[in-house]
Amino acid sequence: MKIIRKIVKSCKDDEMQKPNPVSAPPDDDDLWLPPPEYVPLSEMTGKKNMRNFCINGEVKVCSPNGYSFRIIRHILSSFEGVYSGNRRMIGLVKVVIGLALSGAPVPDGMNWVYKIRRTLIFQWAESSGPLDGEELEYSQEITWDDDSEFVGLQMRVSARQCHIQGRLWCINMNSRACQLWSDMSLKTQQSDEDKNTSLLLE
């Protein structure tokens, strides 16, 4: 056990703040949860409260014994309560983390690294979202440890407004990203002025 503990410590990032522990997942945690209410985006027609963001996102999964998405989903279900970043951009962070984890990981020692670098279009509901010109630098670690297994998520997201043509963030309703957004309780609603647009409520 001491050897495992030493291994675990070696794949943690000393620069990260003290991680937030998460309790063990229930037996039925692997059940699929429906995604939040939204419709697939086609083309932005409404320009109200719309922002283009240049995004860099990284999620590093640290686990000496491997990991399953059941545990990752359980860790992310606590995201709303432990998020330590700018609350005006929590919706953006949830979207980026979901999209990053939907990609293919790159092994890095005992870690698996998921990265996303993209320009994304977001549209927020009235009085929601970041201030004009506001930027984000967010990093946090959330862990799950039950003395027999350790899984840690190291998350980094940077976002700045830019004028590069952005892509729409919403993808296939049955994708892994939608499951992760559901786990993180992503809050959205359909736009009144554009039925093909989802507005972020956070």
From Swiss-Prot:
The keyword Cell membrane does not apply. A motif (PPXY motif) lies at residues 35-38. GO terms for biological process: viral budding via host ESCRT complex. It comes from the Viruses. Gene3D superfamilies: Rhabdovirus matrix protein M2. It is found in: Virion membrane; Host endomembrane system. One of its GO terms (cellular component) is host cell endomembrane system. It is a peripheral membrane protein. It holds the Pfam family Rhabdo_M2. Its main location: virion. Keywords: Apoptosis, Host membrane, Host-virus interaction, Membrane, Viral budding, Viral budding via the host ESCRT complexes, Viral envelope protein, Viral matrix protein, Viral release from host cell, Virion. The keyword Membrane applies. InterPro entries: Rhabdo_M, Rhabdovirus_M_sf. One of its GO terms (molecular function) is structural constituent of virion. Belongs to the lyssavirus matrix protein family. Plays a major role in assembly and budding of virion. Completely covers the ribonucleoprotein coil and keep it in condensed bullet-shaped form. Inhibits viral transcription and stimulates replication. Plays a major role in early induction of TRAIL-mediated apoptosis in infected neurons. Most abundant protein in the virion. Homomultimer. Interacts with nucleoprotein and with the cytoplasmic domain of glycoprotein. Late-budding domains (L domains) are short sequence motifs essential for viral particle budding. They recruit proteins of the host ESCRT machinery (Endosomal Sorting Complex Required for Transport) or ESCRT-associated proteins. Matrix protein contains one L domain: a PPXY motif which potentially interacts with the WW domain 3 of NEDD4 E3 ubiquitin ligase (Potential). This is Matrix protein. It comes from European bat lyssavirus 1 (strain Bat/Germany/RV9/1968). The lineage of its organism: Viruses, Riboviria, Orthornavirae, Negarnaviricota, Haploviricotina.
